Amino acid sequence: MKAILVTVLALAMASRMAGAQQLQLPADKALEERIRTLDLAHAEAIFKGDAAALQELLPDDHTVNHPTNRIVQEKAELLKLIGSGVIRYTRFERRPEKFLFYKDMVVVMGDETVVPAPGAPNAGVVLRRRYTNAWMFHDGKWQLAFRHANNVPPPL
């Protein structure tokens, strides 16, 4: 009797854990292309300092764990940094590598190469970054809810 009870409990726990691990959805090629387009449009908007495009791509509470070792907590703060030249580039290349699909969210992970413009921190230095962007579907559209980017140190 004890062995049966242990077996039933083990199976119940295993099935519960398996269900909990099913958060990630299967790949969706059409959605991947849509998010890839948005992800690259975001990079282009940052590169060009296109405030109108960023207004559309970012929610008001957009948050960035920024490679300058600070957290930028709102779209308005980010736009102010772009307008003041703290965030400005002479080169910005983004290469999305991995897409993870969840209910109402797609996470994109990839690689970036940027060269900050004169007046910006690290001006003229080629910086390689790893990034993670979280795109969320809200109010009928996909927006970049939060982002993390970190500079990769050059090889020794």
Task: Annotate each predicted stretch with a short phrase.
Residues 6-16:
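Bacterial N-terminal signal peptides
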Residues 19-58, 63-156:
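A beta-strand edge to alpha-helix "cap/lid" segment located at domain peripheries
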Residues 1-4:
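Positively charged n-region of N-terminal signal peptides that target proteins for export
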